[in-house]
Amino acid sequence: MKILNISVGMMASARKNEQEQLLHAVDEAWNQGIMVVTAAGNNGPKENSVTIPGISRKVLTVGSWDDNVTETGNSGRLTKNYSGFGPTECCIVKPEVLAPGTNVKSCSKDAKGYIVKSGTSMAAPVVSGAIALAYQKYPDYTPTEMKLKLYESVYPRGEQIGRKCWGMLHVNNLVV
C-alpha cells in the first residue's frame, strides 16, 4: 500500500488521548513509507480550523478550492465557504493543496446508489488519485519526495488566489 486517504477528522476539542492515538497512527504510517492524505475539515475558512489528523507534518492535508460555489440541494441554492485552513498552532501552513470538493457524485451511505456531496472529504480522494498516477511514474518516491513533487506542481500558487496554502492541484504538472 502506497497511499492512505483519510476523509475524516476530529476537532481539537476531542479527548486528548484519542487525538494522540490518531496522530501517532498517521505518523507511523508515514514513517513506514505510506503517503497519508487527509481532508482539512469543513470548519473554515477561519485560521487554525484544520481537523486532526490534518495538522500533522507527516500528512498531506487537502482543502477544497471551490468551496464558494453555489450548490443546489434539497433546501434550494446555498453558498458554502467551509474548507479548514491554517496555520496550525505550530505555524504549519495547512492545507498544503486544494482540489475540487463541491457537488461531487459519491456513494450513498443508505445503499441507495449515489448522492451529491460537498466537503474536503470529497477533495482528498481527488488528490489521492492524482498521487496514485504520480506513483506510476515515480514508484520509488518516499512520501516526503512525493509531497515535494506535489508542492512543485501546484498552480496557481496560494498567494495568487488569496489562500494560505501551496496552491491548487494540477495533475498534469504532477505526472510529467
Language-model segments: which ranges?
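Solvent-exposed, polar/charged alpha-helical surfaces in well-ordered, non-transmembrane soluble domains
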Residues: H24-E28, L60, P125-A132, T144, ...
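Substrate-binding/access-modulating region of protease and related hydrolase catalytic domains
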Residues: M1-K58, E89-I92, D110-A124, G162-R163
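Extracellular S/T/G-rich loop segment that most often corresponds to the catalytic His/Ser-adjacent loop
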Residues: G54-Q136, N173
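C-terminal subdomain of the subtilisin-like protease fold in secreted/lumenal serine endopeptidases
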Residues: M1-N5, Q136-V176
